[in-house]
């Protein structure tokens, strides 16, 4: 089992994704690269990786939720 992410990591990741729609995807490496350019030297490498990991998880969760809502409406 993995450790639970701190709420500040979740809050930062969700704000970044919501303020920049369409930039991030399901690829951790891509998200990490984009975040490193956005947050240049403002956070540690460990924190950057934690944020990128949660961004990836958050994107997957949002897409899964959208897909299940579409199926419930009978559109898929």
From Swiss-Prot:
Coiled coil regions in record: none
Gene Ontology BP terms: translation
Gene Ontology cellular component annotations, sorted alphabetically: ribonucleoprotein complex; ribosome
Pfam families documented for this protein: Ribosomal_S17e
NCBIfam families, sorted: PRK01151.1
Family: Belongs to the eukaryotic ribosomal protein eS17 family.
Swiss-Prot/TrEMBL keywords: Ribonucleoprotein, Ribosomal protein
UniProt name for this protein: Small ribosomal subunit protein eS17
Gene that this polypeptide is encoded by: rps17e
Any one GO molecular function term: structural constituent of ribosome
Classification via InterPro entries: Ribosomal_eS17 (IPR001210), Ribosomal_eS17_CS (IPR018273), Ribosomal_eS17_sf (IPR036401)
